[in-house]
Amino acid sequence: MQSVWNVLTGRAIDYGIADYDVFYFDPDTSWDAEDVVIRKLQARLDHLGVKIETRNQARVHLWYPAKHSLPYPPLSCSTDGIDRFLTQNTQVGVRRTDDGFDVYAPHGFDDVAGLIARPNPGPNFSAANYAAKAARWRALWPELTVIAPE
């Protein structure tokens, strides 16, 4: 999403991007299993020189409540995690398949293309977290329209 904003506003493709998120779903919720994936992916992508944030969506309920002081139920697939993202414009997932890619975007791409940050009023929504994220984005992309939560 931020890369798209950068293209639309004529900025460098990596401008303002702190990290790249990679998420997957593995029923093995052990830290050891996730750590293996993190290390393998980092080794494969290390040449890019960017920070990669890799998370098993099956494990999110184990750490999210302590980090964000909000409840988070166990998920049954990666798209369940996307459905709970803080903003609708970030609710985009791409998965490689044998013959191409599958894209999951429950709210479409209009907000991404329109440089709009819109809250996702899900059960784990935090107005404070949204305000902080929107303020960071607005400082980097002043063209951004930020929709206030209801």
Where are these regions (language model features)?
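Catalytic cores of the polymerase beta-like nucleotidyltransferase superfamily
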Residues: M1-E150
